[in-house]
Amino acid sequence: MESNLQGTFLLNNTQLAQFSEMKAPMCQYSVQNSFYKLSPPGLGPQLAAGTPHGITDILSRPVATPNSSLLSGYPHVAGFGGLSSQGVYYGPQVGSFSKAGNEYPTRTRNCWADTGQDWRGSARPCSNTPDPLSDTIHKKKHTRPTFTGHQIFALEKTFEQTKYLAGPERARLAYSLGMTESQVKVWFQNRRTKWRKKSALEPSSSTPRAPGGASGDRAASENEDDEYNKPLDPDSDDEKIRLLLRKHRAAFSVLSLGAHSV
């Protein structure tokens, strides 16, 4: 039993050995023969012996030129050595260019990167250049006007006489005080609002005036004259305005008569 297995194994090994010896030369011969048939006549002497696809053989090959003997072995490739103009390859209009293709500068950046940079650059919100629209908005910002003491005195005196002004009366008062009708109208609106709030919170009561000497009255009069020449705020200088109205009542009567005569 064992002898039969050994004989069979030896027989099989012998057949395998013969098969490998028979196949190996045929494979080598077929590769060498096919490589020989594909190679041109002038290529054999220039290539070194060995595997044609090795790194050493590939690096040791000479550089092929249009006029070299490597291309001359192929009849359909040898004809390209005589072509000198670009028009033969690309068309007649290309041959009219004075420069070769490699002499023109090439773009190294990607077109998508350039496009992205353009739209990203246009969307940048921050810039050092001033915006004319924002400047116009800041210039149009409403600023509260400041009136002189003479203007506030006349306005307060007129408000004591009447809480509402008609169109002609408002125009005459604005002209006599050097103001605009809009300023007079807004001042009267604010003054009426303040008067209503004050009337609702405080009951009307008269405060007695404290007695004082002549020297004290003179000093107070000088201080009032100084305050009269300074700008006053109708929302915060109520006491000063009341004193000025009491002192210059006669002067304002002359002013009101002159304004109505105009």
Curated annotation (Swiss-Prot):
Domain of life of the source: Eukaryota
GO molecular function: DNA-binding transcription activator activity, RNA polymerase II-specific; DNA-binding transcription repressor activity, RNA polymerase II-specific; RNA polymerase II cis-regulatory region sequence-specific DNA binding
Localization terms from the record: Nucleus
Alphabetical list of CDD domains matching this protein: homeodomain (cd00086)
Keywords linked to the UniProt accession: DNA-binding, Homeobox, Nucleus, Transcription, Transcription regulation
Renumbered residue ranges of the record's region Disordered: 197-237
Gene3D superfamilies: Homeodomain-like
Positions of disulphide bridges: none
Cross-referenced InterPro entries: HD, HD_metazoa, Homeobox_CS, Homeobox_NK-like, Homeodomain-like_sf, HTH_motif
Tissue spec: Expressed in the developing CNS and gastro-intestinal tract.
A GO BP annotation: negative regulation of stomach neuroendocrine cell differentiation
Entry keyword annotation includes Transcription regulation: yes
Record-level GO cellular component terms: nucleus
Role played: Putative transcription factor, which may be involved in patterning of central nervous system and pancreas.
Protein name per UniProt: Homeobox protein Nkx-6.3
Source species: Mus musculus
